[in-house]
Amino acid sequence: LKKYQTTHHLTDSDLEMYQRIMDELKKQIIYLNELTNKSRNLKKIEQVELGVASAKGIFKHLVKYPEAITHFSDFLYHKVPEILRASERFLSIKEDKLSTEEITLATNGILSTIRVLSESITDDYERLVSEASEEIALSKKLVERKNG
């Protein structure tokens, strides 16, 4: 842990806050995965939008680059909590096994919200991958110039 702290230039308070944020994020992603697996509708959204998989990818990135956490405040404090709340609401309504036109409209609205949030999380991850790809391409060009 000390090596990690030193390598990433984290103060004791930075490390404590980082650990707290990452512990919470890990729990949230695990819980989101569990919720997703409880519903065919939620599984379908995940198969198309890849929100849970993308959240896991962002988590891995933040483990490797803790200084990047400041770039993911919307992901951490809005998108993940909101997709969890929406998934819980959807499953709660489905568990009641009541079906009216109003309930169907409400659940469809919730699913739409989940889809949009999932897509947005995947957009965040795609941006991450794109930035990494650009950095690698730039490094390659610099090496080629140096060697050429």
Where in this protein do the model-derived segments appear?
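Soluble C-terminal extramembrane regulatory/interaction domains of multi-pass membrane proteins
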Residues: 46-148
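Membrane-proximal, non-transmembrane interface segments of integral membrane proteins
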Residues: 1-63
